[in-house]
Regions:
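Amphipathic alpha-helical dimerization/coiled-coil segments
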Residues: 2-5, 16-18, 90-131
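Short, flexible loop segments at the rims of nucleotide/cofactor-binding pockets, characterized by
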Residues: 8-10
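Short beta-strand "wing" residues that participate in macromolecule-binding interfaces
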Residues: 75
Length: 131
């Protein structure tokens, strides 16, 4: 599947809106994790595989191609690194991260108010039963 491009239909949208293309790209397995790992500096494929437990090399190379074609990362002497657009993306995602934290807190199950315990009757207050 080719990298999503603004102006063309993408999964879930035929409008070609840039936001929809970006959401399609970032919604692909491991895409955001790869970008997260590159935030501190360049990494090679082996380092990315080691940091992303469960990521297969075929999916890694597919995502690297898509992110490179989209101008978000670029090959470097040390592997792959964020471009100017990739760095700007990190800054743009901070408000979404803050929103997601608030959302997660509001998703915590509400605790039911504690109910008053039933008053216990003392044994002396009970009527005797016949046996």
């Amino acid at each position: 599947m080719p990298a999503p491009r603004p102006g063309t239909p993408v999964r879930g949208s035929t409008t070609g809106r840039p936001l929809m293309a970006a959401m399609d790209l970032f919604g692909r397995r491991w895409a955001l994790r790869i970008l997260w790992e590159l935030r501190a500096g360049p990494l090679g494929a082996r380092a990315l595989l080691a940091r992303c437990e469960g990521l297969s090399s075929s999916v890694l190379y597919q995502r690297l191609r898509e992110l490179t074609a989209s101008g978000i990362i670029s090959p470097s002497a040390d592997g792959y690194e964020l471009t100017r657009l990739g760095t700007a993306l990190g800054h743009a995602l901070r408000p979404l991260d803050e929103w997601a934290t608030t959302w997660a807190q509001e998703q915590e199950p509400e605790q039911e108010p504690e109910q008053e315990p039933e008053p216990e009757q003392e044994l002396d207050d009970q009527e005797p039963t016949e046996t």
